[in-house]
């Protein structure tokens, strides 16, 4: 494959030498570094709890809809979110948050794989988080790893 665009051999894109016909931008994403995982988990759990409560109390949303739509929360799997899931479960058990009006979405699932397989993302999210809180089954959205290839 012959391309008119090349990157430096040591990697990365040199801003001043980027071809003018490539759409690109350099963003400075806000980043927070915490002393430990514990403090990072507390920070994120605080935000999620505040947002879920604010959504439930938002009068302007209630004026638009007859029934309050659920708060939408994206979920990841793997080791990274485990501390957060444990903290959210702890806060649910303490009565600090309810997930009854929260809809969760997972972006991916292994294919082909049944949701009850222990390696499945579906299984892990349920086992590590969802089965411990009061989320409604109809508000859980995880791709189905068992659909046929024709349906993919």
Task: Give the ranges of each region predicted by the language model.
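Short, well-ordered amphipathic alpha-helices
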Residues: 48-53, 82-93, 126-129
């Amino acid at each position: 494959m012959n391309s008119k665009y090349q990157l430096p051999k040591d990697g990365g894109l040199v801003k001043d030498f980027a071809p003018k016909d490539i759409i690109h931008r350099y963003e400075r994403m806000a980043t927070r570094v915490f002393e430990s995982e514990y403090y990072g988990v507390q920070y994120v759990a605080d935000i999620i709890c505040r947002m879920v409560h604010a959504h439930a109390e938002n009068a302007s949303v209630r004026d638009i809809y007859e029934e309050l739509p659920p708060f939408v929360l994206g979920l990841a799997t793997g080791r990274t979110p485990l501390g957060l899931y444990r903290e959210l479960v702890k806060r649910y058990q303490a009565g600090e948050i309810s997930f009854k009006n929260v809809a969760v979405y997972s972006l991916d699932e292994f294919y082909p794989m049944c949701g009850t397989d222990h390696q499945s993302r579906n299984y892990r999210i349920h086992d590590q988080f969802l089965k411990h809180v009061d989320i409604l089954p109809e508000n859980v959205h995880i791709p189905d790893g068992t659909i046929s290839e024709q349906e993919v």
